[in-house]
Amino acid sequence: MSDRDVHDEASNAGEGPATPPLPVRDRSDLADARLRLLSAARRRIAIYQPALSDDVYGSVAELAELRRLATSGRGAEIRLILHAPEDALRDNHRLVALAQRLSSIVLVRTPLEEVDLAYASSYLLTDQGGYLFLPDARRADGRAALADRAAQAPLLQHFNEGWERSARATAWLPLAL
C-alpha cells in the first residue's frame, strides 16, 4: 500500500472526515478494533507486527476477513512486516497457511536493520484510512480509528520506509515439490 495507492483509494472512496477513536484498553478492545478495521478495509492493508501470537490475526473471524481481502480481486494486497516469521511458522500460526496459499497477495517481509528490529510497536493500516497503533506490541493499550488519514500518515510513512529496508520472508514461501 504505497502513498499513491492510499490516495487513489481515498479519491475513489470519497475521503470524509475522521471517525471517532475506537477504545483500545484491553485484549477485548484490541480484538474488536482489529476485526472492525479488517472488516472496513476494501482491498489493501499493511501490518507491522514484531511477533505473531495465536490471539493476533489468528481468530476465525480475523482470518475470514483476511481471506476476503486477499480474494477481493484486482489490487488486493496484504503486506506484513514481521520480525521473526520463523517463530510463527514453527508455532503453526493460522496466518501462515493463508500466506502460503496466496503468496502473490499476502506479502511478508522481515526487517534487516537493527533500527527496525528494535522497533517494539505494532500497527494495522487500512486502505480506508483506518489504523490501530500499539506503542508496545506486547500490551493491549493503544489507539485506533476506522478512518483518520492524518493520524495514519506517519505510520504509513514508517511502514513504507521499513518495507523498503526489509527482505522477503522466505520461510513462509510454499515449497515447490
Show which residues each predicted segment covers:
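PLD/PLD-like phosphodiesterase catalytic module centered on the HKD motif
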Residues: 1-46, 51-177
